[in-house]
Regions:
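Conserved beta-strand position repeated once per blade in WD40 beta-propeller domains
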Residues: 46-51, 80-82, 128-130, 184-186, ...
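Blade-loop segments of beta-propeller domains
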Residues: 64-101, 115-121
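Surface loop/turn motifs at the tips and blade-to-blade linkers of beta-strand repeat domains
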Residues: 37-44, 71-76, 118-125, 174-180, ...
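Beta-strand-rich domains and repeat architectures in extracellular enzymes and scaffolds
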Residues: 36-64, 78-82
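Secretory targeting and sorting signals
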Residues: 1-28
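Loop/turn-rich, solvent-exposed surfaces of beta-rich toroidal or solenoidal domains
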Residues: 179-230
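Conserved blade-ending motifs and adjacent loop-strand segments that build the rim/top face
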Residues: 225-255
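Structural motif
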Residues: 67, 98-106, 147-157, 203-219, ...
Length: 284
């Protein structure tokens, strides 16, 4: 009788553990700790950031309304998002105020600029919030604003022959997510099959926290065909200011060379000018 009860107890515990594991939200214990911050200027450091490595030089480059070239803005591309850089190439994403298309502006290692236009496909949002280039440089992921269940995949301008200047940059594939994400402002590759993303989600209903740092584990490295991704919320991003109110999470950058993750968070109210920050995080 006691042995039978013990067996039933073990089985019940195993079943309960399995149920709890399957029912648990896509939210993991914090694994990234804040190690410091730098002031972020609202004019030219408020949208995104990346590190460009060319030869022996290292450039920390930011985007903001003040970094949009006048001729680009004059043609209707009035918003720049979070950029990325691989193998000396640099790509920054643009959207138009009239919602009529997207553009990716690429700079070669030699410094030459080329524009790659993308016509919206059926059901595609006009937002062009960020770009994230695969570590091998072949493919580029991008994102839409709002509550989404997918990421967009393109051939990387300058690095993939399928991206042709002067022709439409094709939507090559999508990444179907197993959990909705909201207001993602930037992503960067942590590895060939994992991304870290900064979400400006003000609601908190998706993961139980607002402004989360997300991790997306891909089923495989992007190869031009549709694939899936598993979403996990890691922690709330740092929110600290002398002012109270709504923060705005912006772009993100991860550097494997020193393991540093950087995320821009703009402060509320008038403090946006004084104490907006680029936060530095490392795995704890």
């Amino acid at each position: 009788m006691q042995k039978s009860f013990a067996r039933r107890a073990v089985v019940a515990a195993a079943v309960l553990a399995a149920v709890l594991a399957s029912a648990a939200p896509a939210h993991a214990a914090t694994s990234w700790v804040t190690v410091g911050s730098d002031r972020a200027r609202p004019l030219d450091e408020s949208q995104g950031l990346t590190v460009i490595r060319r030869g022996g030089t290292v450039e920390y480059r930011y985007t903001g309304v003040g970094t949009i070239p006048p001729d680009v803005a004059a043609r209707g591309f009035d918003h720049v998002g979070d950029p990325d850089s691989v193998n000396g190439w640099y790509v920054e994403p643009y959207e138009r105020g009239d919602h009529s298309g997207k553009m990716f502006r690429a700079q070669s290692p030699a410094g030459a600029w080329t524009e790659y236009r993308h016509a919206l496909t059926a059901g595609e949002a006009y937002n062009n919030s960020w770009s994230a280039i695969t570590p091998d440089g072949t493919w580029m992921l991008a994102g839409e604003w709002g509550t989404m269940n997918r990421l967009l995949g393109f051939p990387t301008p300058g690095l993939n022959p399928a991206a042709v200047a002067g022709a439409d940059l094709p939507l090559a594939f999508t990444v179907g997510l197993d959990h909705a994400v909201r207001d993602v402002q930037g992503c960067d590759f942590l590895s060939a099959t994992a991304l870290l993303c900064a979400s400006d989600d003000p609601d908190g209903t998706l993961f139980g926290i607002t402004k989360p740092l997300l991790r997306i584990d891909l089923a495989r490295g992007p190869d031009g065909a549709a694939l899936t991704g598993h979403v996990t919320a890691l922690r709330q991003l740092p929110l600290s200011s002398a002012c109270s109110g709504s923060f705005e999470v912006e772009g993100i950058d991860y550097q494997a060379a020193d393991g540093t993750l950087r995320v821009i968070v703009m402060s509320p109210s008038v403090c946006v000018v004084f104490d907006s920050k680029t936060w530095r995080l490392k795995q704890g």
